[in-house]
Structures are given as structure tokens and as C-alpha cells.
């Protein structure tokens, strides 16, 4: 990369900041949510000096205030393939495959995000990106009409496409071009109050699935939520309710724990927004419900062994009493079942359930001859090294689907005959998705190697 080029990490930060400003204007409640999260995070850090020191030690304190994830939905393989190229300019790459059809949502998805520890520390912005699966629309005529509508739309500006080409050709962008790229790329994610279909078509799409209407009826894949990261989601949810926000009844993901794992999410219901639906006589006024506010708390990244235990316990909690996650006692069921999941970092580490980042302490740096021959666990026990949880940077398929469903209007759960199709998704993407377990394994291995360096 030429010395005159701006780092992809810097472009990503500029883009994340610009998107946050835009979304704050479009959805003012998002601004309230960000302020609420910042206040709770400050309280948690003031009350928990050990956590504050851990974040500082792992270059995670600075990223906390800027940390966001967004979510979008696209309609065609061409849109998805171009998005992959757009995100690559910002150092964001597809990680993981998520099949949401199992939860009655006709999409499959990936998360575009940075991969290396250094890039994540600079700015961990991630975008959960879903591709509509038209083949899951049962009505053949509606499926064909949807494909025709989507084929006509252009979700990228000419300027954005030209700058993507330029970045790929030259190996990067200089400052002025990077700023122009952010400006042009942002247009893809902007909300438009004018639909591209008439009201009867919108209703037909809506009857097929609310999300089909959201993808097909508009000019582009408006950002449907932007999520700040909190250090205490239970306190944040209580504060949301105090502020009069229609918060979800259940926090998605694992229960509250001493050692948070994976991801917990909650949100307020989607906003009903005024939309103009065009027709030959000037059009109709209507409404659309899609965009909502969400917060998340991120915990320890689990190994395949840890993830298998998590999935098993989650399934147990959902199946108990046959009420899934909708019963009023779900929180208690979850807490009871997860008593079987170790809740101290020594056990989690020693049983190989989670990934950890190892670093020498001052005592370890002062005694290189002792460090050279001792296993990592012995170094930790002797106070010569620390082992801090590696943050889970990805998503939960069940959680993602639950958030989609609850915010699109509640209880609808439908089973689709076709389910996962990773091969078709990767073909549309133009590359294979990165394996999240391999990424965490590499981060842990790099930290272990650095102990001996």
C-alpha cells in the first residue's frame, strides 16, 4: 500500500462515524440510546476497576465508545457481491454463515468485519448483511414480480462504484478520495420515504413476509438498526424502559453471568414510518415498520466445544415446558439450565470452552528465563502472565432471527422447506466466508507465541 494511501482502518472509522451521525438524524431515539449506553458504561467502569484495567490492557477501552454494528438486507446476488467489494475498501471481510430460514426469516447472512486484533482495536465496526432468498416465496407470480423489481434498482452511486474500482486497481485511496468514498458509500444505506412499488404490491409482499416487503419495496438497503455496545445490558434495558422505550421482554442470548459469553441483545420495537407509495394517479400515503434500536453486550468467544455446550443448554431451556422463549418464565428456565455452564475464567480456560489472550505481566517481563520453559497456565497461576477473554465479534443465529422477528411485528414463525444453502450464498458473495473459530484460534495462538518472543 502506497504511503500516501489512507489505512482501511481509518476509512472504516470515518464511515462508522458518518453512519452514526446519519442514523441519529433519521432515528432520534438512537441518539438517546447511545447517551444511555455511554452513561451506563461509565458507571460500570467506575465500579469495576479490574474490568477497566482489562479493557485498557487489551486496547479495548478506546474502541468501546465508538463500537457499533449495523444490519442491512439486500435483494440480489449482484448487490451482495458489490457490497463485499465496498466493505473490503474499509478492511471488512465476510465472517460466518447464518441461516435464518430455520427461524422463519427468508434470508441467509454473513457479518462483514475486521479480522486482525490490531484492526479490531482501531475500530471494530461490523455489518450483519442478509441476502433475501426469493426461492422461499411460495407465490410464483409474486416471486417473479419481486425479481423484476429488484433487477431494476441501483443501490450504489456511480461515484461509489468508481472509487471501489480505483481502490482495487491502485491498492488503496488517498485522503480526499477516502472522504469522497465514505460520502458516496453512505448513500447506499440511507432511508428513503418513497417506495418503489404501489400500495397493493407492497401489501402482497408484506403478506408473503414483512421482511420481503422491506427489501423489495425500497430504493436501497437502508440501515435497519445501529447497535452500541454496553457493559451491562440488564441495567441498559431497565434504563430503556424508564425512558419510555418499548423494550423487548426478553434479552436474547445467554443469561446474566459473572463471566459473560458470546452476545446478549435487546431492542425497542421498530418505528412506524410514513411512506409514499407511487401509482398512476399520484400515489398513496402509507406506513412501513422496519427500523429499530438495539443494544448489545459482548462476552467471551467460545471454542467449538464451548459453543456445542451453549447450543445444547439453550435448546434445553427453550424446549422446557414447550413454550420456547416466549413463556413468562423463560428467564428463570435459562438461568437454571445455564448453571451447568462453568462461570469462572479459570475453569472456562482449563476446560477449553473459550478463547483467551495471554500477556506477560511486569513480573513475567522481568523474568524471561522463567517464562521460556513454563506452560501458559503455570505462568498465569504464578502471576507471570494474564489471560483475558477474547471478545466475541460475531452474531448468534437464533438471536439474530429473534431480533428480526420481534421488531418486524412479533410472533410470526414459519418453517421453510429449504434451509441452509451456504454454497449458493458464497457463490453470490464471490468468496468463501471466513471461519470465526479459526480467527479466534489464531488470535489466541498469536498471544501465546508473543509470550516467548
Model-derived segments and spans:
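Extended, well-ordered protein cores
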Residues: 1-453
Amino acid at each position: 500500500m502506497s504511503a500516501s494511501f489512507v489505512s482501511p482502518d481509518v476509512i472504516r472509522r470515518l464511515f462508522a462515524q458518518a453512519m452514526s451521525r446519519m442514523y441519529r438524524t433519521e432515528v432520534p431515539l438512537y441518539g438517546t440510546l447511545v447517551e444511555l449506553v455511554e452513561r451506563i458504561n461509565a458507571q460500570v467502569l467506575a465500579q469495576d476497576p479490574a474490568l477497566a484495567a482489562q479493557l485498557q490492557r487489551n486496547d479495548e477501552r478506546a474502541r468501546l465508545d465508538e463500537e457499533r454494528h449495523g444490519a442491512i438486507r439486500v435483494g440480489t446476488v449482484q448487490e451482495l457481491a458489490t457490497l463485499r467489494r465496498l466493505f473490503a475498501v474499509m478492511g471488512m471481510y465476510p465472517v460466518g454463515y447464518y441461516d435464518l430460514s430455520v427461524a422463519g426469516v427468508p434470508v441467509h447472512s454473513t457479518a462483514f468485519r475486521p479480522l486482525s486484533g490490531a484492526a479490531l482495536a482501531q475500530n471494530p465496526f461490523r455489518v450483519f448483511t442478509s441476502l433475501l432468498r426469493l426461492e422461499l416465496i411460495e407465490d410464483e407470480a409474486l416471486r417473479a414480480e419481486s425479481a423484476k423489481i429488484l433487477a431494476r434498482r441501483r443501490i450504489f452511486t456511480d461515484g461509489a462504484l468508481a472509487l471501489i474500482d480505483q481502490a482495487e486497481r491502485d491498492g488503496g485511496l488517498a485522503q480526499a478520495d477516502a472522504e469522497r468514498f465514505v460520502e458516496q458509500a453512505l448513500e447506499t444505506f440511507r432511508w428513503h420515504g418513497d417506495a418503489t412499488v404501489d400500495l397493493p404490491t407492497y401489501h402482497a409482499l408484506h403478506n408473503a413476509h414483512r421482511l420481503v416487503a422491506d427489501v423489495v419495496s425500497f430504493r436501497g438497503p437502508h440501515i435497519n438498526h445501529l447497535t452500541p455496545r454496553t457493559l451491562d445490558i440488564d441495567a441498559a434495558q431497565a434504563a430503556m424502559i424508564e425512558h419510555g422505550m418499548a423494550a423487548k421482554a426478553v434479552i436474547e442470548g445467554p443469561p446474566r453471568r459473572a463471566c459473560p459469553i458470546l452476545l446478549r441483545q435487546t431492542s425497542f420495537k421498530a418505528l412506524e414510518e410514513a411512506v409514499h407509495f407511487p401509482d398512476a394517479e399520484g400515489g398513496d400515503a402509507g406506513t412501513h415498520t422496519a427500523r429499530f434500536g438495539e443494544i448489545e453486550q459482548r462476552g467471551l468467544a467460545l471454542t467449538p466445544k464451548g459453543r456445542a455446550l451453549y447450543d445444547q443448554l439453550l435448546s434445553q431451556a427453550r424446549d422446557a415446558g414447550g413454550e420456547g422463549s416466549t413463556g413468562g418464565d423463560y428467564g428463570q428456565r435459562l438461568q437454571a439450565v445455564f448453571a451447568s455452564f462453568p462461570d469462572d475464567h479459570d475453569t472456562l480456560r482449563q476446560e477449553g470452552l473459550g478463547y483467551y489472550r495471554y500477556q506477560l505481566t511486569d513480573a513475567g517481563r522481568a523474568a524471561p528465563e522463567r517464562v521460556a520453559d513454563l506452560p501458559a497456565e503455570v505462568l498465569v497461576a504464578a502471576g507471570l502472565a494474564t489471560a483475558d477473554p477474547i471478545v466475541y465479534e460475531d452474531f448468534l443465529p437464533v438471536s439474530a432471527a429473534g431480533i428480526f422477528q420481534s421488531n418486524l411485528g412479533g410472533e410470526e414463525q414459519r418453517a421453510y422447506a429449504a434451509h441452509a444453502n451456504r454454497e449458493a450464498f458464497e457463490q453470490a458473495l464471490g468468496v468463501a466466508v471466513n471461519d470465526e473459530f479459526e480467527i479466534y484460534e489464531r488470535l489466541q495462538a498469536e498471544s501465546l507465541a508473543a509470550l516467548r518472543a
